[in-house]
């Protein structure tokens, strides 16, 4: 350990209406990755490396992805972040502090400390989709000049499962 396993294949969704713009059509190419780590600290380090990887990937595409704490939903786990791109065609309403776009991550090292600090920097700024939106917190933590309310598309999602899968398998 650690081990990274990748699951890449075409996926099909039997939905009445595709969700989240172009990323959730009836048929799409899913690229999943799973890390298997020795302990919780190493697993969080893997999580944070994926967090940075998403930011760097979209930056190379000249897109600003906003990391937002997300609900783990039916997939479960202890922690989750969605990466949202601002788009008029998006179905998610997003609320964020404009200063989040000023966080510089381009030269972030991949050691434990640097990655934890990076995630903490992003999490100091309010960023939520309509599912996690809290008007009182938004008003309290973001002054009017920095408020951004718009639409976005989910372009990535990471989960920290903890021992959700390894425990039942006695791994």
Regions found by a protein language model. Give the residues of each.
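TRNA-recognition modules of translation machinery and tRNA-sensing kinases, especially anticodon-binding
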Residues: 1-171
């Amino acid at each position: 350990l650690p081990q990274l396993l990748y699951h890449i294949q075409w996926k099909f969704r039997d939905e009445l209406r595709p969700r989240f713009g172009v990323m959730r059509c009836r048929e799409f190419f899913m690229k999943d990755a799973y890390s298997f780590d020795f302990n919780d600290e190493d697993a969080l380090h893997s999580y944070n490396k994926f967090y940075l990887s998403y930011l760097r990937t979209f930056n190379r595409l000249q897109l600003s992805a906003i990391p937002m704490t997300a609900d783990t939903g039916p997939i479960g786990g202890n922690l989750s972040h969605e990466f949202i791109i601002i788009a008029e065609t998006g179905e998610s309403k997003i609320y964020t502090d404009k200063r989040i776009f000023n966080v510089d991550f381009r030269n972030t090292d991949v050691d434990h400390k640097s990655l934890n600090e990076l995630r903490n920097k992003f999490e100091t700024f309010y960023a939520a989709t309509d599912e996690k939106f809290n008007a009182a917190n938004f008003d309290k933590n973001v002054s009017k000049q920095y408020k951004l309310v718009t639409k976005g598309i989910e372009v990535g999602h990471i989960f920290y499962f903890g021992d959700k899968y390894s425990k039942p398998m006695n791994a």
